[in-house]
Amino acid sequence: MVLADVGGSISRALAMSSAAVVDESVLRECLNEIARALMQSDVRFKTVCDLQANIRKTVNLEALAAGTNKRRIIETSVGKELCKMLDTGKPAFVPKKGKPNVVMFVGLQGSGKTTTCTKYAHYHQRKGFKPSLVCADTFRAGAFDQLKQNATKAKIPFYGSYMESDPVKIAVEGLEKFRQEKSDLIIIDTSGRHMQEAALFEEMRQVAEATKPDLVIFVMDGSIGQAAFDQAQAFKQSASVGAVIVTKLDGHAKGGGALSAVAATKSPVIFIGTGEHIDDFDVFNVEPFVARLLGRGDLPGLIDKMESIVPADQQSELVAKLSEGAFTLRLLYEQFQNLLKMGPMSQIFSMLPGFSSELMPKGQEKQSKEKFKRYMTIMDSMTPAELDSTNPKLMTESRIIRVARGSGRKVKDVMEMLEEYKRLAKMWSKRNVSKLIPQNGKMSAQAIQKMLKVMPPQVVQQMGGKSGLEALLKQLGGGKDTSKMLAGMRGGA
């Protein structure tokens, strides 16, 4: 995420406050650096000035008693003001299971509205809802085809028409159909336009009047920066918008400006889109978001993300297999799948305290994903016996040649994958796994040392070596959360 650049700049600015003597000049330089970072993210000038003024009111260096941790006070004040800048203070509507929740999506053409409808449905489907999609966009050619393709891929029921041109009629018919089918989350995708025009707002009003949605969500392109204020305000006044989803925050420098501008309209942001994949869709909670920007991480969010991908029963099964020393190629394959589902690794790094998404150099993340997919392609050409075996010697030269031919890869690629497997299998052998999985909330020094050996050097350096890893495990709250993390992230070392 480009927003990570903003977070990196703010973190570096706060590092100035660790100077031997924190005086007025240090504070001024720190605040100026933060202001520059926010301005580069297209946050409004007045908003930045207000933030600086509020921090200065809180951090009165001359009035602080001797021995006071000035750096901590500055960090806390910056965090609070960033939260205030992004927080509307208004809770958004939350769908409830067991009753039909009707949600209507509105937005300008090109904002990613139709894709976001599917992401929203998919997110709630994983939470146990029974979602459905209605395409009431009759303005854009290909809108129904796009929704149909997305919904089919995500296995979500959908409704639309190639013949009917009245969006109100389609919306009502789709609503009735899915109510009869006991869908508890009916999502209506409406038409977009290239600009805010009267025809668009009138159509939205008619669809809303006919369907009486529980929530109207405005989907907004995050790349427009502070111009988001006018857009969000116009839609809020014309369509009774109850929540906002900001998209395209993975590749634009103006995301911070867009988020702060929307917050200024008092419209709560509930999700942010961070990529094109269906899982590149994150719940937006202000405090964890700011904590990630400041390098404090978001461990509850990370664990929740892992649990949504690896259910609790599968985690227990995984730990049981590892405890028996059964680290197979099939298990490695499943963990590669889990890692790919978790979204960008840079995003995962930002959720760990003391880390930053800047840790993942540009281009390296793509290479890592390509490597995972390459290994999975190779394993697709293996037999069940080969995938489930714990004996590395089973893969003889003739088998390796056969797998290479079947997967369309070179023999050296197969050898590389097998070496990676052997390294991980050795680490998660029955002898080692009991030492690595925390017991009674603690990990031994030997276990921590083993973890350090298998972690990439740049990661170890970023977290501050052994002491940094120990601090991270302490913040995880003991064995329970640490076990969840280990269960969710195995296979990606």
Curated annotation (Swiss-Prot):
Superkingdom classification of source: Eukaryota
Physiological role: Component of the signal recognition particle (SRP) complex, a ribonucleoprotein complex that mediates the cotranslational targeting of secretory and membrane proteins to the endoplasmic reticulum (ER). As part of the SRP complex, associates with the SRP receptor (SR) component SRPRA to target secretory proteins to the endoplasmic reticulum membrane. Binds to the signal sequence of presecretory proteins when they emerge from the ribosomes. Displays basal GTPase activity, and stimulates reciprocal GTPase activation of the SR subunit SRPRA.
InterPro entries in the record: AAA+_ATPase, P-loop_NTPase, Signal_recog_part_SRP54_M_sf, Signal_recog_particl_SRP54_hlx, Signal_recog_particle_SRP54_M, SRP/SRP_N, SRP54, SRP54_euk
Region (M-domain): 295-493
Organism name: Hordeum vulgare (Barley)
Compartments, record wording: Cytoplasm; Endoplasmic reticulum
Designated gene of the protein: SRP54-3
Residues noted as binding GTP in the record, renumbered to the chain: 107-114, 189-193, 247-250
Subunit description: Component of a signal recognition particle (SRP) complex that consists of a 7SL RNA molecule of 300 nucleotides and six protein subunits: SRP72, SRP68, SRP54, SRP19, SRP14 and SRP9.
A Pfam cross-reference name: SRP54_N
GO MF annotations, alphabetized: 7S RNA binding; ATP hydrolysis activity; endoplasmic reticulum signal peptide binding; GTP binding; GTPase activity
EC number per UniProt: 3.6.5.4
Family: Belongs to the GTP-binding SRP family. SRP54 subfamily.
Catalytic activity, as annotated: GTP + H2O = GDP + phosphate + H(+)
Protein name: Signal recognition particle subunit SRP54 3
Free-text comment about domains: The NG domain, also named G domain, is a special guanosine triphosphatase (GTPase) domain, which binds GTP and forms a guanosine 5'-triphosphate (GTP)-dependent complex with a homologous NG domain in the SRP receptor subunit SRPRA. The two NG domains undergo cooperative rearrangements upon their assembly, which culminate in the reciprocal activation of the GTPase activity of one another. SRP receptor compaction upon binding with cargo-loaded SRP and GTPase rearrangement drive SRP-mediated cotranslational protein translocation into the ER. The M domain binds the 7SL RNA in presence of SRP19 and binds the signal sequence of presecretory proteins.
Keyword list, A-Z: Cytoplasm, Endoplasmic reticulum, GTP-binding, Hydrolase, Nucleotide-binding, Ribonucleoprotein, RNA-binding, Signal recognition particle
Region annotated G-domain, chain positions: 1-294
GO cellular component, one term: signal recognition particle, endoplasmic reticulum targeting
A GO biological-process term: SRP-dependent cotranslational protein targeting to membrane, translocation
Enzyme class: hydrolase
